[in-house]
Curated annotation (Swiss-Prot):
The modification N-acetylalanine is found at A2. It is found in: Cytoplasm. The active site is at H65. This is Carbonic anhydrase 1. Catalyzes the reversible hydration of carbon dioxide. Can hydrate cyanamide to urea. Zn(2+) binds at H95, H97, H120. It comes from Rattus norvegicus. Keywords: Acetylation, Cytoplasm, Lyase, Metal-binding, Zinc.
Length: 261
């Protein structure tokens, strides 16, 4: 996945992705607008169960359009089970999406309402596949927890992550990031909506069972500004900040959104 051929500006942004990635116009694309009146309560949905080992946090990487906090996923130490999932899924990384102002930046919307940002915790099906790279293109390959972020009080649980950004300011930089429990970033209620969708940026594989938390988490305007301080340019190049990195909602095309609550 060459990140040079896509991005979030007018020349290479979401409207252009279908030229290189025709699946961008597929039937199961993400994100979506969640219409709460049309989400169907499904009593068969189980509670979501996460068990994360802080020792599996490994490093933080500037990938150009965002940054990833990467986990050791060589064994089942940090896993997601339950919810809509038949298998156990292993945490591989989390990342964020944001916008150039505080009134938008999330990828998923709820009844048309935009949030200030969105956290994605990415897991792969370790019961069926041997690596994230193998699972990424399989229909049951990935499960992503999406947490909407709303501007408000500062979030102390986010601060360790945000403070590490200075060590990976430019594209391609990586730095150790250890002993972190990502469950500290989850809301207190794990009520959720779920639907079948895709990665929200190229290669846009339709391989994701989405678990979108009903409850949002907060972060302050200053914390949002820290996200926007990340650079998509490499060291020695003119500085290009990542001001915005979210895809707009895609058509539902007949899919069902289920609610656990």
């Amino acid at each position: 996945m060459a990140s040079a051929d896509w991005g979030y500006d007018s020349k290479n942004g979401p409207d252009q992705w279908s030229k290189l990635y025709p699946i961008a116009n597929g039937n199961n694309q993400s994100p979506i607008d969640i219409k709460t009146s049309e989400a169907k309560h499904d009593s068969s949905l189980k509670p979501v169960s996460v068990s994360y080992n802080p020792a599996t946090a490994k490093e933080i990487v500037n990938v150009g359009h965002s940054f990833h906090v990467v986990f050791d996923d060589s064994s089942n130490q940090s896993v997601l089970k339950g919810g809509p999932l038949a298998d156990s899924y292993r945490l591989t990384q989390f990342h964020f999406h944001w916008g150039n102002s505080n009134d938008h930046g999330s990828e998923h919307t709820v009844d048309g309402a935009k949030y200030s940002g969105e956290l994605h915790l990415v897991h792969w099906n370790s019961a069926k596949y041997s690596s994230a790279a193998e699972a990424i293109s399989k229909a049951d390959g990935l499960a992503i927890i999406g947490v909407l972020m709303k501007v408000g009080p500062a979030n102390p649980n986010l601060q360790k992550v945000l403070d590490a950004l200075s060590s990976v300011k430019t594209k391609g930089k990586r730095a150790p990031f250890t002993n972190f429990d990502p469950s500290s970033l989850l809301p207190s209620s794990l009520d959720y909506w779920t639907y079948f969708g895709s990665l929200t940026h190229p290669p846009l594989h339709e391989s994701v069972t989405w678990v979108i938390c009903k409850e949002s988490i907060s972060l302050s305007p200053e914390q949002l500004a820290q996200l926007r301080g990340l650079l998509s340019s490499a060291e020695g190049e003119p500085a290009v900040p990542v001001l915005s990195n979210h895809r707009p909602p895609q058509p539902l095309k007949g899919r069902t959104v289920r609610a656990s609550f």
